[in-house]
């Protein structure tokens, strides 16, 4: 008899991991935040700019106020292992959205393994976003010709994402 196996195209994979530091101002502090991201991810960060002017905070539209790095494939997996170590492998249940993505923050870059406080850099926290997708079929939403929506049965649920992180990264979910 044949044993039943899961369809490999329904397997969940990590699409990308986005690491963001929002500084809120341009200048030397922004450059130090970029240096922190480069030390942690070994990738050159991209600068994010303000979408609108806020006079109270002295921010003009188009002014660089943050840095981010997008990691994919093996780089994303290795960074996530370090990030979960910094969070003691515990993520709150409210960090997951209904689309199966996960978001959490790290309050200080010195929580990462092997990082020491540098007074020239200062203290920077960061936001981490993990975007999941199924192994196949997501191109139909992005392609130019015959665009379609992802069917409901192919969408990733919050529970599937939690199960994936528990199995692959030994993450404990707090607040179940």
Curated annotation (Swiss-Prot):
MF (Gene Ontology) = rRNA binding; structural constituent of ribosome; tRNA binding
- Which Pfam families does this chain map to? Ribosomal_L5, Ribosomal_L5_C
Coiled-coil annotated spans: none
Looking up InterPro entries in the UniProt record yields:
Ribosomal_uL5, Ribosomal_uL5_arc, Ribosomal_uL5_C, Ribosomal_uL5_dom_sf, Ribosomal_uL5_N
GO BP terms: namely: translation
Q: What are the record's GO terms for cellular component?
A: ribonucleoprotein complex; ribosome
Key words of the record: Ribonucleoprotein, Ribosomal protein, RNA-binding, rRNA-binding, tRNA-binding
What family does the entry list?
Answer: Belongs to the universal ribosomal protein uL5 family.
According to the record's subunit comment, the protein's assembly and interactions are: Part of the 50S ribosomal subunit; contacts the 5S rRNA and probably tRNA. Forms a bridge to the 30S subunit in the 70S ribosome.
Checking NCBIfam families in the record gives: PRK04219.1
The record's function comment reads:
This is one of the proteins that bind and probably mediate the attachment of the 5S RNA into the large ribosomal subunit, where it forms part of the central protuberance. In the 70S ribosome it contacts protein S13 of the 30S subunit (bridge B1b), connecting the 2 subunits; this bridge is implicated in subunit movement. May contact the P site tRNA; the 5S rRNA and some of its associated proteins might help stabilize positioning of ribosome-bound tRNAs.
Against HAMAP family, the record matches this protein to: Ribosomal_uL5_A
Q: What is this protein called?
A: Large ribosomal subunit protein uL5
Organism listed in the record: Picrophilus torridus (strain ATCC 700027 / DSM 9790 / JCM 10055 / NBRC 100828 / KAW 2/3)
Q: What is the lineage of its organism?
A: Archaea, Methanobacteriati, Thermoplasmatota, Thermoplasmata, Thermoplasmatales
